[in-house]
Amino acid sequence: LLDTATLSSAASLDLSSVSPDVISPGDLPGSVAFGINPRNASAPALPTTFSYDSTNFLGSFSGTIEHTGSVFFNADAVEVGNFTIGFDGNRAGTLGGAASGFFVESTTGIAAILFDIENPSNLVATDSSLTIDANLLVSPEFGQFLVDQALAATNLQGADVGDARVAAVPEPTGLALLALGGLAVLRRR
């Protein structure tokens, strides 16, 4: 659930539209979702390279989960999209200990890490599926961008602005992800 009211009041960002490849609505009312790019995606889409060992998920996570599609704000003047979900151990424990190390990066429009993913409230990693539910926290990079662009009066880093769900299905012969899952960004009201 993306807290559009908080983004509007705190950061002057008003959701205006989504690109045609975004699933709207997603599985839940008021949501948008992004399919996971396949491992064999070709340019300009980035291929998903993510893999893990279900017995040691956090210790074995490698690669990224890639998505195609954009979300637009302020009469389509501000674009974020073609999201990468990745892991950086140096981010773990930041934001007052809340950051898990996972992040959401926009690779089009505002090309920056937008959100740190909080330590998950739900994490189920098996050989046949992966589900992660967690809060989206404004990253230090996005917080500074909002201040620099005069969209926010103060740096909002660490502010909870929504919830993320990653639902993915590994290939039966390995742990590569298919385009059967997605990152859901939902409006929170």
Question: What spans do the regions from the language model cover?
Answer:
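C-terminal membrane-anchoring or membrane-association module
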Residues: 185-189
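N-terminal segment immediately downstream of the Sec signal-peptide cleavage site
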Residues: 1-58, 135-168
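N-terminal cationic amphipathic segment used for targeting or macromolecule association
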Residues: 109, 123, 132, 148, ...
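Predominantly extracellular/secreted and cell-surface proteins with exposed
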Residues: 23-109
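Short, threonine-centered small-residue motifs that mark membrane-proximal processing/anchoring sites
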Residues: 161-183
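Contiguous ligand/interfacial binding patches
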Residues: 108-141
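Intrinsic disorder/low-structure terminal segments
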Residues: 86, 101-102, 114, 141-144
